[in-house]
């Protein structure tokens, strides 16, 4: 009797979760380094347009809802966990779609990196500060960067898919 190896049609989940784990590790290690090196609000200019600075974000992207009474910590944590469940489902179903899955893996790693901050500290640790003259882009972290790159790749993948079906 011949043995057949069944390969799931959905593709493997492990490689994508591995990418998410790498994002989480780099994100958390960078935040630990900043916490050990900087006092809150301290900044170190690396170039004429880029500083490292330690700030806490109790809200969402760009400080949205950061001045709310505290409920946002749990709301954004729940949102991150919900996004994790949806992304894991999508990765199981579409793991063979490389660009789509890579984008989701980056978003997942970034979302979980920020969820970990909210659970451990009650806020997200941000430290990358780009500026021009007196204008500063809101500080962010590696998790935010992974989410942004993942979102851009997701949009690119969808545009490519739509154009391919015309």
Curated annotation (Swiss-Prot):
One GO term (biological process): proteolysis
TM segment ranges: 9-29, 45-65, 71-91, 99-119, 135-155
Protein name as it appears in the record: Lipoprotein signal peptidase
UniProt keyword terms in alphabetical order: Aspartyl protease, Cell inner membrane, Cell membrane, Hydrolase, Membrane, Protease, Transmembrane, Transmembrane helix
Function summary: This protein specifically catalyzes the removal of signal peptides from prolipoproteins.
Membrane topology summary: Multi-pass membrane protein
Active site: 126, 144
Catalytic activity, reaction form: Release of signal peptides from bacterial membrane prolipoproteins. Hydrolyzes -Xaa-Yaa-Zaa-|-(S,diacylglyceryl)Cys-, in which Xaa is hydrophobic (preferably Leu), and Yaa (Ala or Ser) and Zaa (Gly or Ala) have small, neutral side chains
Subcellular location: Cell inner membrane
One Pfam family per UniProt: Peptidase_A8
InterPro entries assigned: Peptidase_A8
Source lineage: Bacteria, Pseudomonadati, Pseudomonadota, Betaproteobacteria, Burkholderiales
GO terms assigned for molecular function: aspartic-type endopeptidase activity
């Amino acid at each position: 009797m011949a043995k057949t190896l069944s390969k799931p049609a959905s593709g493997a989940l492990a490689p994508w979760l591995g990418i998410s784990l790498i994002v989480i590790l780099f994100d958390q290690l960078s935040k630990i380094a900043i916490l050990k090196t900087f006092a809150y609000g301290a900044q170190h200019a690396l170039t004429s347009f880029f500083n490292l600075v330690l700030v806490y974000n109790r809200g969402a992207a760009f400080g949205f809802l950061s001045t709310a009474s505290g409920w946002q910590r749990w709301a954004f944590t729940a949102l991150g966990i919900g996004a994790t469940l949806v992304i894991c489902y999508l990765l199981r179903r579409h793991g063979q779609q490389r660009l789509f899955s890579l984008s989701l893996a980056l978003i997942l790693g970034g979302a979980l990196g920020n969820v970990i901050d909210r659970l451990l500290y009650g806020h997200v640790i941000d430290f990358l500060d780009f500026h021009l003259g007196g204008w500063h882009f809101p500080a962010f972290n590696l998790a935010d960067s992974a989410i942004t790159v993942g979102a851009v790749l997701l949009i690119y993948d969808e545009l490519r898919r739509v154009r391919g079906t015309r």
